[in-house]
Amino acid sequence: MDSPEVTFTLAYLVFAVCFVFTPNEFYSAGLTVQNLLSGWLGSEDAAFVPYHLRRTSATLLCHSLLPLGYYMGMCFAASEKQLYSPGQAPEAWQLFLLLAVTLPLLSCTLIYYWSWDRWTRHPLAQTLALYALPQSGWQAVASSINTEFRRIDKFATGAPGARVIVTDTWVMKVTTYRVHVAQQQDVHLTVTESRQHDLSPDSNLPVQLLTIRVASTSPGTQPFDIRLNSSEYGELCEKLHAPIRSAANVVIRQSLGDLFLETFASHVEVNPAYSVPSNQELEPCIGCMQTRASVKLVKTCQEPAVGECQQCYCRPMWCLTCMGKWFASRQDPQRPDTWLASRVPCPTCRARFCILDVCCVR
């Protein structure tokens, strides 16, 4: 391939991937189906269900046009191939053009089928029909969802391509091409998986992501999974009427403090150990009185007379967990990215120390 072809192909590939799996930069620039077609889609707050009936259809059509857009761009990037004249183009490109034209035609056919009889055949409308009373239709269920979505007390989280919304009556997951819906009174929720991620875009602390299986007892409904940060788990439980069960061996760390304590302990473990004199007996931790003292503050971050940290002369009096809780209690909750690098006073003598000065007792 010539250089213009390679350049255009790589650039278009990046654009297509970002347009389908939209990053924050594309949202900020307004390069989304929701923003480009906002005049036709209407307002999500005003009419949640009609908005997503149109949005899912428009998204399917726009994404199906991407191969055709690539072909049209290659007409200029590789003009010597005469792609603008399909009859003279190479056979491989003729097949690609056939595929590029077929995809939008199939999408239009499917969208027309969905929209027939006021969107009754759309997957979202068919799901809502499962919850409709015998004397009413799916539109009555849609009206209920529209009303509850407008309330400010709903729970909403997640990226635009995988949003989780919980209202007083409904549990919903909004994805690129579908909207999953379940009625709260009929669902069983189970935490099936928890994953720890060491990197967070907002702080130096690890992030735990939970996967919750939402299974409805209503006939004909399909279960779906929702994912959220463990720090939002408590807020989700407050909005749900049904309890959430946990699968075996799934540990949920709900608070920022829980995540920090784990990170604090992992950092302390790699610090130099402190050897207790043979004639000194370790006493119970004065913080919890449940375990023996297990840490000693020893200035190891810098030379004794250098820096802000000070030497602590207290004997081992605290366990690792209580020292971590003390360290966290002295931090700004709005600035978790500064916690690990900060300095706090010793809880006993007030000598300032950092995390590098906390040594495990051996």
Curated annotation (Swiss-Prot):
Transmembrane region(s): 7-27, 57-77, 95-115
An annotated GO BP: retrograde protein transport, ER to cytosol
Zinc finger boundaries on the chain: RING-type: 285-350
Pathway annotation from the record: Protein modification; protein ubiquitination
Gene Ontology terms, MF aspect: ubiquitin protein ligase activity; zinc ion binding
Topology feature Cytoplasmic, residues: 28-56, 116-362
GO CC terms, sorted: endoplasmic reticulum membrane
Lumenal side: 1-6, 78-94
Enzyme kind, highest EC tier: transferase
Catalytic activity, EC: 2.3.2.27
Pfam family, one: Tmpp129
Subcellular location: Endoplasmic reticulum membrane
Matches recorded under InterPro entries: TM129
KW Ligase (keyword) present: no
Topology of this chain in the membrane: Multi-pass membrane protein
Keywords per UniProt: Endoplasmic reticulum, Membrane, Metal-binding, Transferase, Transmembrane, Transmembrane helix, Ubl conjugation pathway, Unfolded protein response, Zinc, Zinc-finger
Catalytic activity: S-ubiquitinyl-[E2 ubiquitin-conjugating enzyme]-L-cysteine + [acceptor protein]-L-lysine = [E2 ubiquitin-conjugating enzyme]-L-cysteine + N(6)-ubiquitinyl-[acceptor protein]-L-lysine
Family according to the record: Belongs to the TMEM129 family.
Protein role: E3 ubiquitin-protein ligase involved in ER-associated protein degradation, preferentially associates with the E2 enzyme UBE2J2. Exploited by viral US11 proteins to mediate HLA class I proteins degradation.
Complex and partners: Integral component of ER-resident dislocation complexes.
Notes on the domains: The RING-type zinc finger domain is responsible for E3 ubiquitin ligase activity.
Protein name (record): E3 ubiquitin-protein ligase TM129
Organism expressing this protein natively: Mus musculus (Mouse)
Gene name of the record: Tmem129
